[in-house]
């Protein structure tokens, strides 16, 4: 079915309109929905492509683990590189850029074979393209640590690096910053390393589910608690969790299906209980009156007894984009809109006449 949403355009997202295969299942669990998604993706991709497709069950990755290992909640599992936390390894370091910072490390197998230009280019990418303050690196050779921050790699530090998987012949990249920033930049550096070193597995579709999303997040700008992902999902632990737990520790029954670094579907076990709904929104700063006013259709429907239900919505356009090996949705849409959300072929949106407005009882009042 077509879905209309006010979203900014990008390579994997069409402005204004897209198609979803939307389904809801009564008296269903999260796992049952994931099994349906597995069947949809495996059968469709096997039928219409000749690439290798992951067999069910797909990997289930908790959101926290995804952010720690990949720096993103839609990881491309064709890329074998993993982000490691190296904060404790450098706790006694004399390197000022690492002091009092979260330090993320990426071990690149056989990376010591790369020349200085490669490391300079990666540093330039990190600083100019993704906003890093810098990108530290070192090679582990037979002669010992070489290049970059080699002089700060003590025997104790080297031992710590070996514990996270580094060995002679490898190179390492380090990002030091505040926790969330370091995590995000490390994720982008990981992706770029995979591309530049040609590490991405070819002719294969690697699927996974991201699960256990946080129900809430802290909004630093407004100093308040906000919903993290989907406000209408069921919190894990129900009312007891909402009443007794730190909101930032509450997880939700929310899940995303991911393939090759793209979000393919999003879904949740829905919150069908009006009391739970009011309490969940209260934590995010909404009064019961606001919930009734802004979400009246749901709130009022729930009063009549809605069955427990769960669902998801795979994106049809995005599935087609991957199955045709394109990297932009415009290539698989018959009449794509431009970046200003205009349909150039039809000349839409366009001005309407007074008669047309009168027919639908709309009046334009100019200020």
What are these regions (language model features)?
Residues 1-367:
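Class II aminoacyl-tRNA synthetase catalytic cores and aaRS-like
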């Amino acid at each position: 079915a077509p879905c209309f949403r006010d979203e900014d355009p990008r390579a994997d997202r069409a402005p204004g309109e897209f198609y979803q295969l939307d389904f809801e299942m009564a008296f269903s669990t999260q796992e049952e929905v994931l099994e349906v998604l597995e069947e949809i993706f495996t059968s469709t991709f096997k039928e219409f492509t000749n690439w290798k497709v992951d067999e069910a069950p797909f990997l289930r990755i908790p959101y926290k683990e995804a952010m720690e290992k990949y720096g993103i909640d839609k990881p491309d599992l064709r890329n074998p590189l993993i982000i490691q936390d190296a904060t404790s390894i450098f706790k006694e370091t004399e390197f000022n850029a690492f002091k009092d910072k979260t330090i993320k490390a990426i071990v690149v197998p056989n990376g010591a074979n790369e020349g200085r230009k490669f490391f300079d280019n990666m540093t330039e990418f990190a600083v100019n393209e993704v906003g890093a303050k810098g990108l530290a690196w070192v090679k582990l050779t037979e002669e010992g640590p070489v290049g970059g921050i080699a002089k700060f790699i003590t025997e104790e530090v080297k031992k710590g690096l070996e514990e996270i998987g580094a060995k002679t012949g490898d190179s390492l990249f380090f990002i030091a910053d505040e926790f969330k920033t370091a995590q995000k930049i490390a994720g982008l550096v990981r992706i770029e390393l995979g591309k530049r070193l040609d590490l991405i597995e070819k002719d294969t579709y690697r699927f996974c589910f991201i699960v256990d999303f946080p129900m809430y997040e802290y909004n630093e700008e407004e100093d308040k608690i906000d919903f993290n992902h989907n406000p209408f999902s069921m919190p894990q632990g129900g009312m007891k969790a909402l009443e007794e737990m730190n909101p930032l520790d509450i997880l939700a029954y929310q899940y995303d299906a991911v393939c090759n670094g793209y979000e393919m579907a999003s879904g949740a076990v829905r919150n069908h209980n009006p009391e739970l709904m009011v309490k969940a929104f209260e934590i995010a700063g909404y009064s019961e009156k606001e919930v009734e006013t802004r979400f009246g259709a749901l709130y009022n429907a729930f009063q009549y007894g809605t069955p427990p239900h769960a669902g998801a919505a795979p994106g049809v356009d995005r599935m087609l984009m991957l199955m045709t090996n394109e990297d932009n949705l415009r290539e698989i849409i018959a009449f794509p809109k431009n970046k200003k959300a205009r349909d150039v072929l039809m000349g839409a949106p366009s001005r309407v006449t007074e008669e047309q407005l009168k027919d639908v009882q709309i009046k334009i009042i100019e200020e």
